[in-house]
UniProtKB/Swiss-Prot annotation:
Interacts with OASL, ATF7IP, ATF7IP2 and BAHD1. Binds CHAF1A and the SUV39H1-CBX5 complex via the MBD domain. Binds MGP via the TRD domain. May be part of the MeCP1 complex. During DNA replication, it recruits SETDB1 to form a S phase-specific complex that facilitates methylation of H3 'Lys-9' during replication-coupled chromatin assembly and is at least composed of the CAF-1 subunit CHAF1A, MBD1 and SETDB1. This is Methyl-CpG-binding domain protein 1. The modification Phosphoserine is found at S409. Zn(2+) 1 binds at C194, C197, C200, C233. It comes from Mus musculus. Residues 1-69 form the MBD domain. Transcriptional repressor that binds CpG islands in promoters where the DNA is methylated at position 5 of cytosine within CpG dinucleotides. Binding is abolished by the presence of 7-mG that is produced by DNA damage by methylmethanesulfonate (MMS). Acts as transcriptional repressor and plays a role in gene silencing by recruiting ATF7IP, which in turn recruits factors such as the histone methyltransferase SETDB1. Probably forms a complex with SETDB1 and ATF7IP that represses transcription and couples DNA methylation and histone 'Lys-9' trimethylation. The gene is Mbd1. The methyl-CpG-binding domain (MBD) functions both in binding to methylated DNA and in protein interactions. The third CXXC-type zinc finger mediates binding to DNA containing unmethylated CpG dinucleotides. Residues 83-97 have a biased composition (Basic residues). One of its GO terms (cellular component) is nucleus. GO terms for molecular function: DNA binding; double-stranded methylated DNA binding; unmethylated CpG binding; zinc ion binding.
Length: 636
């Protein structure tokens, strides 16, 4: 058919139809049907066409692909057809009889009188064999239908009487009548109730359970509604509790010698498992259906358990269950302990929704739209990965504690919910940082790395990472990292460098550091102008709040002089600068490199004379950058 619009008189004047064929893709060659209304609207399915025309137009007989009305052809059955079906099984018997009659006449004509007895005997034998085969087939069919069956409830053998219901085939007449009466009684209890139990005497709904809260007024007015959970008859037997008809359900007392009865009961808790002799046989049959076919066949062939006489076993007094649980199977309730709450909750085989229906979170109807669970929902633009209810709608009684909002959330609904994201995996550190941490064998916060003398190599600049400081020729470096107990080794150090760990005293106050980065580097032609001096803060008379470091025994001690009055005044000013926040100093937790040079070949004579000045300069200068002029003024 051409892909042009054609008239469709079946729908009325003005309607057009078009069939377009697919020319590419996996469905090449298939066609799509389109219809165009008199107003120009394009319709491509029968559902859209029904919605467009409305309920007044019946399209049950309309063929959407052909565009025609298909009237059903009435099926006419001739009268001769049933008669032919009836005569079909009788035709082979007649033909056999005719063939046997012809054989008899031929034998009588062709054979003499003394020889025709044997063929007739063989013919009669063949007839008897065929008749016996047909009779044996019918007998086997009748025998299979009337084979003795063992009753699944009482265990007696009975003959099958042609019951069509599959669940009643394995029950005898008495057990079948009890089963039918029990089902009829249970239906009455579900509709009306017994009228005697405590639940049937309640006349008003609680208004708290999920049935009362989810019910619409129109359902209540029409009468098609579920009963309140507190008004449901107590004589209703749930499927998980048993059928109430078999021997296991009718047993009222525990045996006292099975593995369940011999368990020591916990104080304050009811037993969760039922005695093996009181378990329903129907439940065992249902569980075997879920297993393999071999297990079901074995279960059907296994004989029923013999009843245990009560006279052989004396029931011990400490295992008597009458004071722990009711004896009636209808009132026997299992309990389970929740992981978060130490309260007893009724045990059911069905999936439980964790809500009580009475707390403020359960009564809340609207999502907050700001917690992490709401942000994950598709209606708020999320990816639907967590699939959890709003944190502010999680039940306060049954929900898990990790799903509830944090305690410090305050009055704001969306505040305080980010601490739950601490369970996520940490971000991976770059490979360079991991190599630096693994390559450092030291555990002390300070480490001294001495570079061998020699000219500065250009490869060091290439090996130095971003943000690192290149070592100066013939200098010693002191690496200090606040907030950690591991030393960091900067790139570019020699393999034969000496490492001396220094043990730091445990101090809770923040440690002040001396930072002299970006010192002007001299040319490599004059290495004798640089003289390396490594200084350790060993004085116990330093300012309060600074940790003292142990000195290296290999280095020569530094002469210390008592501070003068000017230094005392400056120390008092430095005490005020200690109160400045860490952000002004340059941040906490950044590695600091201390380099001390004796410019002009002179050695440093006193550490306490210039240390307070450097502290003051470090507190004032936020960028931790010192010019060469400031360095010379402070050192000299």
């Amino acid at each position: 058919m051409a892909e042009s619009w054609q008239d469709c008189p079946a729908l009325g004047p003005g309607w057009k139809r078009r069939e377009s064929f697919r020319k590419s893709g996996a469905s090449f060659g298939r066609s799509d049907i389109y219809y165009q209304s008199p107003t120009g609207e394009k319709i491509r399915s029968k559902v859209e066409l029904t919605r467009y025309l409305g309920p007044a137009c019946d399209l049950t007989l309309f063929d959407f692909r052909q565009g025609t009305l298909c009237h059903p052809i009435p099926k006419t059955h001739p009268l001769a057809v049933p008669s032919k079906k009836k005569k079909k099984p009788s035709k082979p018997a007649k033909t056999k009889k005719q063939q046997v009659g012809l054989q008899r006449s031929e034998v009588r004509i062709e054979t003499p009188q003394g020889e025709y007895k044997a063929p007739t005997a063989t013919a009669l034998a063949s007839l008897s064999v065929s008749a016996s085969a047909s009779s044996s087939a019918s007998a086997s069919a009748s025998a299979s239908s009337h084979a003795p069956v063992c009753c699944e409830n009482c265990g007696i053998h009975f003959s099958w009487d042609g019951v069509k219901r599959q669940r009643l085939k394995t029950l005898c007449k008495d057990c079948r009548a009890q089963r039918i009466a029990f089902n009829r009684e249970q239906r009455m209890f579900k509709r009306v109730g017994c009228g005697d139990c405590a639940a049937c005497l309640v006349k008003e709904d609680c208004g708290v359970c999920s049935t009362c809260r989810l019910q619409l007024p129109s359902d209540v007015a029409s009468g098609l509604y579920c009963k309140c959970e507190r008004r449901r008859c107590l004589r209703i037997m749930e499927k998980s509790r048993g059928c109430g008809v078999c021997r296991g359900c009718q047993t009222q007392e525990d045996c006292g010698h099975c593995c369940i009865c011999l368990r020591s009961p916990r104080p304050g808790l009811k037993r969760q498992w039922r005695c093996l002799q009181r378990r329903c046989f129907w439940g065992k049959r249902d569980s075997s259906k879920r297993g393999s076919k071999v297990a079901s066949q074995r279960h059907s062939q296994a004989p029923p358990l013999p009843p245990h006489p009560a006279s052989q076993y004396t029931e011990p007094t400490e295992l008597h269950i009458s004071d722990i649980a009711p004896t009636s199977p209808a009132e026997f309730i299992y309990y389970c302990v929740d992981e978060d709450e130490d309260e007893l909750q009724p045990y059911t085989n069905q999936r439980q929704n964790r809500k009580c229906g009475a707390c403020a979170a359960c009564l809340r109807r609207m999502d907050c739209g700001r917690c992490d669970f709401c942000c994950d929902k598709p209606k708020f633009g999320g990816g639907n990965q967590k699939r959890q209810k709003c944190r502010w709608r999680q039940c306060l009684q049954f929900a898990m504690k990790r799903l509830l909002p944090s305690a410090g959330s305050g009055s704001g609904e969306g505040a305080g919910l980010r601490p739950y994201q601490t369970h996520q995996t940490h971000q991976k550190r770059p490979a360079s940082a991991r190599q630096l941490q693994l390559s450092s064998p030291l555990k002390a916060p300070w480490a001294v790395v001495t570079a061998p003398p020699g000219p500065v190599r250009d490869s060091r600049k290439q090996q130095a990472g971003r943000g690192s400081v290149l070592p100066q020729p013939d200098t010693d470096f002191v690496f200090l990292q606040e907030g950690t107990s591991s030393a960091m080794q900067m790139p570019g150090t020699a393999a034969a460098s000496t490492e001396v760990p220094v043990q730091a005293a445990q101090c809770s106050a923040p440690s002040w550091v001396v930072a002299l980065p970006q010192v002007k580097q001299e040319t490599a032609d004059a290495p004798e102008e640089w003289t390396a001096v490594t200084t350790f803060l060993t004085s116990s008379t330093l300012q309060s709040g600074f940790p003292s470091k142990a000195a290296d025994p290999d280095l020569s001690p530094v002469k210390q002089e008592p501070p003068g009055p000017e230094e005392d005044g400056e120390e008092k000013k430095d005490d005020v600068s200690e109160t400045t926040p860490a952000e002004e100093i340059g941040g906490v937790g950044t590695p600091v490199i201390t380099e001390i040079f004796s410019l002009g070949g002179t050695r440093l004579r006193d550490a306490e004379a210039w240390l307070p000045r450097l502290h003051k300069l470090l507190a004032v200068n936020e960028k931790e950058y010192f010019t060469e002029l400031q360095l010379k003024e402070e050192v000299l």
